Amino acid sequence: MGQKIHPLGFRLGFIQEHYSHWFAKANSYSELLQEDKEIRSCIYNHIRNHVRNSSNYGGIARINIYRRTDLVQLQIHTGFPALLIENRIRGLEHLRRDIQEKIDHKKRKLRMTLVEVLKPYTEPTILAEYIALQLENRVAFRRVMKKAIQLAKISDIKGIKIQIAGRLNGAEIARNEWIQKGRLPLQMLRANIHYCHYPAHTIYGVLGIKVWIFREKII
């Protein structure tokens, strides 16, 4: 039976980096790790409640967290920064207040910056969120997968694979369907492969979405 390894964890320390960049003492490590999780959840919940709707999706590719003794610095990599900037009341200022409440008990400062992703559809997280939004709007899954591949291929990637699992089109029995275009060398460490799994909440239940994107080979 084949054993599958996480594509990002497999390359961590070689061509992939951690999303949290800090050191801590052993007695406070777990607390800071939990705080990182809460900060990321706060950002994603804000996007889901105040930015995302039937036609817009958040477009968050990743969130990097840097820490100093009295400073927490967030880098939010997004393909569509205008969605967060255009409405200041519900946008960055509201998000900043929510995050500050989570770290205020340590009297630390918060610095938050937006980094624009120039080719958003080369990011599997953004592509998976697009697929989830379409599935939640009851678009046929095969049409969604083909459209997602078209969006990704415009950005000159080497290969892509999309898998959707669950009660597809409301079927009684759950199954998984996938489509692949181009190369996807999962066992090559030098292959710059990005991966994401994302849930889609439909009226028939939760569908699981997985996206693999092969950008280039690192020499």
UniProtKB/Swiss-Prot annotation:
Biological processes annotated in GO: translation
SUPFAM superfamilies, per database record: Prokaryotic type KH domain (KH-domain type II) (SSF54814), Ribosomal protein S3 C-terminal domain (SSF54821)
MF terms (GO), sorted A to Z: rRNA binding; structural constituent of ribosome
Pfam family name, one: Ribosomal_S3_C
Keywords: Chloroplast, Plastid, Ribonucleoprotein, Ribosomal protein, RNA-binding, rRNA-binding
Domain named KH type-2: residues: 47-118
Record-linked InterPro entries: KH_dom-like_a/b, KH_dom_type_2, KH_sf_prok-type, Ribosomal_S3_C_sf, Ribosomal_uS3_bac-typ, Ribosomal_uS3_C
GO cellular component terms attached to this protein's record: chloroplast; cytosolic small ribosomal subunit
Primary subcellular site in the record, as a coarse category: plastid
Subcellular location: Plastid, Chloroplast
Top-rank lineage group of the source organism: Eukaryota
PANTHER family reported in the protein's UniProt record: 30S/40S RIBOSOMAL PROTEIN S3, SMALL RIBOSOMAL SUBUNIT PROTEIN US3C
UniProt family annotation: Belongs to the universal ribosomal protein uS3 family.
Quaternary structure (record): Part of the 30S ribosomal subunit.
Protein name per the record: Small ribosomal subunit protein uS3c
